[in-house]
């Protein structure tokens, strides 16, 4: 059993609803007359969706034993995404609906991690930062490099994000897959 004092980013545990979750971010809060609470941003493994919640310091949770294996995304066909285990070279097909948030960033030959619980593939974890190409955006105007204004741009995977005005069509950008945000030009 683990408690909120054991919390750290990347810790995987079973929450009060029986869901297996990973800690993305956490903060301990204490107000003068109130009890302390721990605010946590969690990623639900299996669906990839995020949820924010609070726990009391005395709350206990069941720790989950997870094995991480290196994977490579190969291709999507129909409603399945195909990955290859880089150690055994076995191919695994994962339903696209199980990759709810991850599929927005999948490009061929992308390195990722397969999470195994009880020797069964439970989730695919993408790298935090990925390099993607801008498919379309309105052109920038000379002198826009000083401003911090943004414009919308569509990536090669179809995702629309906000980028600085100096980014043009065909540029490669680094994206943060956790927050779906632009980081920098590649």
From Swiss-Prot:
<dbReference type="InterPro" id="IPR015365">
    <property type="entry name" value="Elong-fact-P_C"/>
</dbReference>
<dbReference type="GO" id="GO:0003746">
    <property type="term" value="F:translation elongation factor activity"/>
</dbReference>
<dbReference type="InterPro" id="IPR013852">
    <property type="entry name" value="Transl_elong_P/YeiP_CS"/>
</dbReference>
<dbReference type="Pfam" id="PF01132">
    <property type="entry name" value="EFP"/>
</dbReference>
<keyword id="KW-0251">Elongation factor</keyword>
<dbReference type="InterPro" id="IPR020599">
    <property type="entry name" value="Transl_elong_fac_P/YeiP"/>
</dbReference>
<dbReference type="InterPro" id="IPR014722">
    <property type="entry name" value="Rib_uL2_dom2"/>
</dbReference>
<comment type="function">
    <text>Involved in peptide bond synthesis. Stimulates efficient translation and peptide-bond synthesis on native or reconstituted 70S ribosomes in vitro. Probably functions indirectly by altering the affinity of the ribosome for aminoacyl-tRNA, thus increasing their reactivity as acceptors for peptidyl transferase.</text>
</comment>
<dbReference type="InterPro" id="IPR013185">
    <property type="entry name" value="Transl_elong_KOW-like"/>
</dbReference>
<dbReference type="GO" id="GO:0043043">
    <property type="term" value="P:peptide biosynthetic process"/>
</dbReference>
<dbReference type="Pfam" id="PF08207">
    <property type="entry name" value="EFP_N"/>
</dbReference>
<comment type="similarity">
    <text>Belongs to the elongation factor P family.</text>
</comment>
<dbReference type="InterPro" id="IPR001059">
    <property type="entry name" value="Transl_elong_P/YeiP_cen"/>
</dbReference>
<dbReference type="InterPro" id="IPR012340">
    <property type="entry name" value="NA-bd_OB-fold"/>
</dbReference>
<protein>
    <recommendedName>
        <fullName>Elongation factor P</fullName>
    </recommendedName>
</protein>
<dbReference type="Pfam" id="PF09285">
    <property type="entry name" value="Elong-fact-P_C"/>
</dbReference>
<dbReference type="GO" id="GO:0005737">
    <property type="term" value="C:cytoplasm"/>
</dbReference>
<dbReference type="InterPro" id="IPR011768">
    <property type="entry name" value="Transl_elongation_fac_P"/>
</dbReference>
<comment type="pathway">
    <text>Protein biosynthesis; polypeptide chain elongation.</text>
</comment>
<keyword id="KW-0648">Protein biosynthesis</keyword>
<dbReference type="InterPro" id="IPR008991">
    <property type="entry name" value="Translation_prot_SH3-like_sf"/>
</dbReference>
<keyword id="KW-0963">Cytoplasm</keyword>
């Amino acid at each position: 059993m683990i408690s909120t004092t054991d919390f750290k980013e990347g810790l995987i545990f079973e929450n009060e609803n029986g869901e297996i979750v990973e800690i993305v971010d956490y903060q301990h809060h204490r107000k003068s007359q109130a009890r302390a609470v721990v605010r946590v941003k969690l990623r639900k493994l299996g669906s990839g969706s995020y949820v924010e919640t609070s726990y009391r310091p005395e709350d206990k949770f069941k720790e989950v034993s997870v094995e991480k294996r290196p994977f490579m995304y190969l291709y999507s066909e129909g409603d399945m995404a195909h990955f290859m285990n880089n150690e055994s070279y076995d191919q695994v097909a994962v339903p696209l609906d199980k990759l709810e948030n991850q599929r927005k960033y999948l490009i061929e030959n992308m390195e990722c991690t397969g999470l195994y619980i009880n020797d069964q593939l439970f989730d695919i974890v993408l790298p935090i930062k990925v390099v993607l190409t801008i498919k379309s955006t309105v052109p920038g105007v000379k002198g826009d490099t000083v401003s911090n204004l943004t414009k919308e741009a569509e990536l090669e995977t179809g995702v629309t994000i906000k980028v600085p005005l100096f980014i043009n069509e065909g540029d490669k950008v680094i994206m943060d897959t956790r927050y779906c945000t632009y980081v920098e030009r590649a």
